[in-house]
């Protein structure tokens, strides 16, 4: 029996004996056990197979059609080693086209899996990934233009775990699914018959698609039996449009050890951790007593996202300590970040994100008509209208003829697959200035093919846990600056993407292609 299997059996057996009598039945019956994605490693030929298909999943007692990689919902965690090439064979068993994007990986445009990397129904695509970047938690998901939001909503997402020599020398928790736990958080909206209820319309093109049910690794409010000691959580905000703000129900601190692109120089202690759509953070939390506690998400001031039940702290998962000790530690130092180079003489690119004023107004009107003032998340409606210079929106009924599919733009242009906007020089630092001035919507801006450093975020210096390697930056009614460098080729036919990771904004034009 392998050590991991032995530990799993030990944990399972230990749960019953470690809990008081009154809570054993509760643990067994009240909540589902946190599903743990398989950790997928290469076969003898250094290959990995991913099959995209439809299946069925049960939520709240009702069965829904869902999509997954190698299963009914979500997918495995693909384990990659720095310096080792891996070929991934991707089979599409859906009845429609899809793509598979390696979010956070520094790989050439040809294998990045953007909207050009189409896999037809019944088709296959093989990509070879030569990983040369630090240990990190990344992920993979569809990037089919105009349909990314729907395909992710249906269940397509999986993790990528990159390992290197440096991280293996640290005494971090590393028993997969025991004290090293993936946590993929997504909200879903269901129809009355229990199916995933996705719409791309004026309202969702403006504020994004959101639901009233929170899933953690595909389960509603699951529980995890955690050994005593340090518990490592690999957090992914896999929501289409909802930002999250993680905390613990008993106010025990989170120690952030890694962001999108890898380890921070040292742990950063926080009481709450905002995470934007597409972002990953690794945190350690101390499980040093017998008291169960919840990982929760706190209310956020984002349009549409303060509607019940998210107007109050909402449970993500229950963590139940058991009478087994883990061996992981919280190191004082983690990694070394290179000093920022001089910014003198660098190419500066200015990207202005914009939403059609008509879309902004019509979407907001529909949101308020459906959900009331609570949908405004505490924002002053008149101030917002004034900020956008729109005046009264009650005259904005265009009978549904408004073309929202190209209403979101960058530098005045909606996405055009055949026209990259610019060419970045390979191996050269550039300073990108990304502005959201002109609307009050949240735009988590993601850049393919790189891990960058944030120079300023929404007009302020980045928080300590956001000053490491990142692939997504917050833009919300202000300006953010990032220092980027691209080490791989991305010719016109395999251009990289840069876009808002609120998926409905991306699907309706807020994306550009660029070459390297």
Curated annotation (Swiss-Prot):
Q: Which residues make up the binding site for Cu cation 1?
A: 101, 446
Q: Name one GO cellular component term.
A: periplasmic space
Q: What are the binding positions for Cu cation 3 in this chain?
A: 143, 448, 499
UniProt binding sites for Cu cation 4: 443, 500, 505
- Database matches in CDD domains: CuRO_1_CueO_FtsP, CuRO_2_CueO_FtsP, CuRO_3_CueO_FtsP
Residues involved in Cu cation 2 binding:
103, 141, 501
Q: How does activity depend on pH?
A: Optimum pH is 6.5 with 2,6-DMP as substrate. The pH dependence of the reaction as monitored by oxygen consumption shows a broad activity peak between pH 5 and 6 and a second activity peak at pH 8.
The primary site where this protein sits is periplasm
Q: Which cofactor does it need?
A: Cu cation
Q: How does activity change as temperature rises?
A: Optimum temperature is 55 degrees Celsius with 2,6-DMP as substrate.
Q: In the UniProt record for this chain, what is stated about the effect of gene disruption?
A: Disruption mutant is slightly more copper sensitive on complex medium than wild-type strain under aerobic conditions. Deletion of the gene does not affect copper sensitivity under anaerobic growth conditions. Deletion of the gene leads to elevated biosynthesis of enterobactin under conditions of iron scarcity when copper is present.
Q: What is the effect of changing residue 360 to A?
A: Strong decrease in oxidase activity with 2,6-DMP as substrate. Loss of the copper tolerance phenotype
Give one GO biological process term. Answer: response to copper ion
Explain what switches its activity on or off, per the activity regulation comment. Ferroxidase and phenoloxidase activities are enhanced considerably in the presence of excess copper ions. A labile regulatory copper ion near the T1 copper site is important for the copper associated activation of enzyme activity. Ag(+) acts as a potent inhibitor of oxidase activity by binding at Cu(+) binding sites, blocking Cu(+) substrate binding and oxidation. pPD oxidase activity is strongly inhibited by sodium azide, an inhibitor of the electron transfer.
The keyword Isomerase belongs to this UniProt entry's keyword annotation: no
Domain comment text? Contains a methionine-rich region, which includes a helix that covers the entrance to the type 1 (T1) copper site and blocks access to the T1 site in the absence of excess copper. This methionine-rich insert is involved in the binding and oxidation of Cu(+). It also binds additional copper ions, which are important for the copper-associated regulation of activity. The methionine-rich region provides at least three additional Cu(+) binding sites: Cu5 (sCu), Cu6 and Cu7, which play related but distinct roles in CueO oxidase activities.
This protein's assembly is summarised as:
Monomer.
Tell me the protein family, please: Belongs to the multicopper oxidase family.
Q: What does this protein do?
A: Multicopper oxidase involved in copper homeostasis and copper tolerance under aerobic conditions. Is responsible for the oxidation of Cu(+) to the less harmful Cu(2+) in the periplasm, thereby preventing Cu(+) from entering the cytoplasm. Probably primarily functions as a cuprous oxidase in vivo. In vitro, in the presence of excess copper ions, exhibits ferroxidase and phenoloxidase activities. Fe(2+) is an excellent substrate in the presence of excess Cu(2+), but is inactive in the absence of Cu(2+). Oxidizes the phenolate iron siderophores enterobactin, 2,3-dihydroxybenzoate (2,3-DHB) and 3-hydroxyanthranilate (3-HAA). Oxidation and thus inactivation of enterobactin could protect cells from the interaction of enterobactin with copper and play a central role as an interface between copper detoxification and iron homeostasis.
Q: What is this protein called?
A: Multicopper oxidase CueO
Origin organism of this chain? Escherichia coli (strain K12)
Q: What's the source species' lineage?
A: Bacteria, Pseudomonadati, Pseudomonadota, Gammaproteobacteria, Enterobacterales
């Amino acid at each position: 029996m392998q050590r991991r299997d032995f530990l799993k059996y030990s944990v399972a057996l230990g749960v019953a004996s470690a809990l008081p009598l009154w809570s054993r039945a509760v643990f067994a019956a009240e909540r589902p056990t946190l599903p743990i994605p398989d950790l997928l490693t290469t076969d003898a030929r250094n290959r990995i197979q991913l099959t995209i298909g439809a299946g069925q999943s049960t939520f709240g007692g009702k069965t829904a059609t869902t999509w997954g990689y190698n299963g009914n919902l979500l997918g495995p965690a693909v384990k990659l080693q720095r310096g080792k090439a891996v070929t991934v064979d991707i089979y599409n068993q859906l009845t429609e086209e899809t793509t598979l994007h390696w979010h956070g990986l520094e790989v050439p445009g040809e294998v990045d899996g953007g909207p050009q990397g189409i896999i037809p129904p019944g088709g296959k695509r093989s990509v070879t990934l030569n990983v040369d970047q630090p240990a990190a938690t990344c992920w993979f998901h569809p990037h089919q233009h105009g349909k990314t939001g729907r395909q992710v909503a249906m269940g397509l997402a999986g993790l990528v775990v990159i390992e290197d020599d440096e991280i293996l020398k640290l005494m971090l928790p590393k028993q997969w699914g025991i004290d090293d736990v993936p946590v993929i958080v997504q909200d879903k909206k269901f129809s009355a018959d229990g199916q995933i209820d996705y719409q791309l319309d004026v309202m969702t093109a403006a504020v994004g698609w959101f639901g009233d049910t929170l899933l953690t690794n595909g389960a509603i409010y699951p529980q995890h039996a955690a050994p005593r000691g340090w518990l490592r959580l690999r957090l992914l905000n896999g929501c289409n449009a909802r930002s999250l703000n993680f905390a613990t129900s008993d106010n025990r601190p989170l120690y952030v050890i890694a962001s999108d692109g890898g380890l921070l120089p040292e742990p950063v202690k926080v009481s709450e951790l905002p995470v934007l759509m597409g972002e990953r953070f690794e945190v350690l939390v101390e499980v040093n007593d017998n008291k169960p506690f919840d990982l929760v998400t706190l209310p956020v001031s984002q349009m549409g996202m303060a509607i019940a039940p998210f107007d109050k702290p909402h449970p993500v998962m229950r963590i139940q300590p058991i009478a087994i000790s883990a061996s992981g530690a919280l190191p004082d130092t983690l990694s070394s970040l290179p000093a920022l180079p001089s910014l003198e003489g660098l190419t500066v690119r200015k990207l202005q994100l914009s939403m059609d004023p008509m879309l902004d107004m019509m979407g907001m009107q529909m949101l308020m008509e459906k959900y009331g003032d609570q949908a405004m998340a505490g924002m002053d409606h008149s101030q917002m209208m004034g900020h956008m210079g729109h005046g009264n929106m009650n005259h904005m009924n265009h009978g549904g003829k408004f073309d929202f599919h190209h209403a979101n733009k960058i530098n005045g242009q909606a996405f055009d697959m055949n026209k990259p906007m610019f060419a970045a020089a390979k191996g050269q630092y550039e300073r990108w200035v990304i502005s959201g001035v002109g609307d009050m919507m949240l735009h988590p801006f993601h850049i393919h093919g790189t891990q960058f450093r944030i120079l300023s975020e929404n007009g302020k210096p980045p928080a300590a846990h956001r000053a490491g390697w990142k692939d997504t930056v917050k833009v919300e009614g202000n300006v953010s600056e990032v220092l980027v460098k691209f080490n791989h080729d991305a010719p016109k036919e395999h251009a990289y993407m840069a876009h808002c990771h609120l998926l409905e904004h991306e699907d309706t034009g807020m994306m550009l292609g660029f070459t390297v």
